[in-house]
Amino acid sequence: MKLIIFTGLVLFAIVSLIEAQAENEKACLPQYQVCTDAPGNCCSNVVCDCYGRYKSGARIGRNCFCLQKGVIYKREN
């Protein structure tokens, strides 16, 4: 009887641990995906980089994308 109770408790602990780990592993956004509404959801190898959009000198919005860490993007004419 004690063995059955012990086995049940061990199985319960294992299932609880697996469920807790699954909750912590949220889907992340890969490179070049839009992260404007979720800046903390980019995968670990990329960072959410935001850029302001301007028209005639007035700011009209911003765009955020998951981009490689440490990479500098420059506009080409």
Swiss-Prot record:
Signal sequence range: 1-20
Provide any one GO MF term from the record.
toxin activity
Its domain of life?
A: Eukaryota
Any one annotated GO CC term: extracellular region
Subcellular location(s): the record lists: Secreted
Question: In which tissues has expression of this protein been reported?
Answer: Expressed by the venom gland.
Q: Which Pfam families match?
A: Toxin_35
Point out the propeptide residues.
21-26
PTM statement from Swiss-Prot or TrEMBL: Contains 4 disulfide bonds.
Provide this UniProt record's keywords sorted from A to Z.
Disulfide bond, Secreted, Signal, Toxin
Q: Which InterPro entries match?
A: Spider_toxin_CSTX_knottin
Q: Which family does it belong to?
A: Belongs to the neurotoxin 19 (CSTX) family. 08 (U8-Lctx) subfamily.
Q: What is this protein called?
A: U8-lycotoxin-Ls1d
